A protein has these predicted regions:
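Hydrophobic/small residue at the entry helix of a nucleotide-binding pocket
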Residues: 12
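N-terminal Rossmann-like NAD(P) cofactor-binding module of classical short-chain dehydrogenase/reductase
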Residues: 71-76, 96-98
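Beta-loop-alpha module in the N-terminal Rossmann-like domain of NAD(P)-dependent dehydrogenases
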Residues: 73-88, 103-105
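Aromatic pocket-lining residues of Rossmann-like dinucleotide-binding sites
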Residues: 20, 89
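Rossmann-fold NAD(P)-binding glycine/threonine-rich loop
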Residues: 99-120
Length: 360
């Protein structure tokens, strides 16, 4: 049994915390609104007051002098709040998994982490996360790539009218995703393009036409995979992003209203779909597709994101030396670890089609 501290128990965080508790681990949950895990056996709740630092609360509530153990910290607080926690954790000799997906990536704390003996694995969701792992496998097989593309989205299973969308994560983070310029690779160099550009129609099996547009999701891949052209596109039902653009350009976009209008509704069927493609210079091409419609244990995007993180946690607990001190992106994980993560997700009912899905 390990002692694991979960910062943030929202849709994704609660999934991870519950899975860890069900596996017999001692889980400490830190959140200002921990309602999703109240009453769950094996989870001790630490209520965060507004503005409180979860790292300080963790050390205060479980002092080291009293035999306090930190086997692993899982930071699932969103955006800048989560980034501040990971930066603080980089100054302590603990293992951390970072799922904050902040604009300010934790690789900037690599030197600090090495100095203090901290090991941080970041962005281990579905995309970024599993997408990085798959592209790293393509790079290991092909060498430098000619082209790489990721298309991913969590959406209602069919158009619902209006926005045709509900946010599986914080709507504020989705708005940030739609406004932050997209960093991509063109002619082997990093360039910045306007968010939501390169809008195009794609066909998603069993769903029909959907719309893809550039977003800033490559992150660590910008510096880790040698490639001529690389892009990440978010996928939505047609009309959704044009409605956002029209309201934004006309000055009537109200972020407070969006948070209400995009609120997740557990009664609405939804699915997550991802396609990862890599092309070699000799013409070889590999494609993976990932699809999930959720299950009794959670909605699809939260489940997929949480499953990748959960699998990484299990791997790291079984091999404490899996990663040395420093800050590590998901593509730095060994092939055998990636293979086991894929198989664990398959065992959980996530559909993954492509190479490495039957390796032991």
């Amino acid at each position: 049994m390990a002692v694991i501290h979960c910062f943030g128990v929202g849709l994704v965080g609660s999934y991870v915390a519950k899975r860890l508790a069900q596996a017999g681990h001692e889980v400490h949950a830190y959140d200002p609104k921990p309602h999703r895990v109240i009453g769950i056996q094996g989870i001790e709740i630490h209520l965060l007051e507004p503005g409180e630092d979860p790292v300080e609360v963790m050390v205060r509530d479980c002092p080291v002098d009293d035999g306090f153990a930190i086997d692993l910290v899982v930071n699932m607080l969103p955006g800048s709040i989560g980034h501040a926690s990971t930066t603080a954790l980089a100054a302590s000799p603990w293992r951390t998994i970072d799922l904050s997906f902040s604009e300010f990536t934790p690789d900037r704390d690599d030197e600090k982490a090495r100095e203090h003996g901290a090991s941080i694995l970041w962005d281990v969701g579905i995309a970024p996360g599993l997408s990085n792992m798959l592209l790293s496998e393509a790079y290991r097989d092909f060498g430098s790539l000619k082209k790489a593309e990721v298309r991913v989205g969590g959406n209602p299973t069919e158009p619902t009218g209006g926005w045709n969308y509900m946010a599986p994560f914080s709507p504020i983070d989705v708005i940030a995703e739609y406004t932050r310029p997209a960093r991509v690779i063109r002619d082997s160099a990093e360039v910045t393009l306007p968010a939501l550009s390169e809008k195009h129609i794609i066909e998603v099996p069993e769903k029909g036409d959907m719309e893809a547009f550039l977003t800033d999701g490559l992150r660590s891949l910008l510096n880790s995979i040698p490639v001529i052209e690389m892009s990440e596109y978010t996928v939505r039902w047609p009309g959704h992003i044009q409605m956002f653009i029209d309201k934004r350009d006309s000055g009537v976009l109200d972020e407070v209203d969006l948070q209400s209008q995009w609120q997740y509704d557990s009664k609405t069927p939804e699915f997550t779909w991802m396609e990862v493609m890599a092309e070699a210079f000799d013409g070889r091409r590999v494609t993976w597709t990932v699809q999930d419609h959720g299950s009794d244990d959670g909605h699809s995007m939260g489940r997929c994101t949480g499953l990748v993180a959960y699998c990484c946690i299990i791997e790291w607990l079984e091999d404490p030396d899996m990663l040395p001190p420093g800050v590590h992106a998901p593509e730095s994980l060994p092939s055998e670890v990636i293979s086991r993560i894929i198989n664990m997700m398959l065992d959980e009912g996530v559909e993954i089609i492509g190479p490495m899905t039957s390796h032991s």
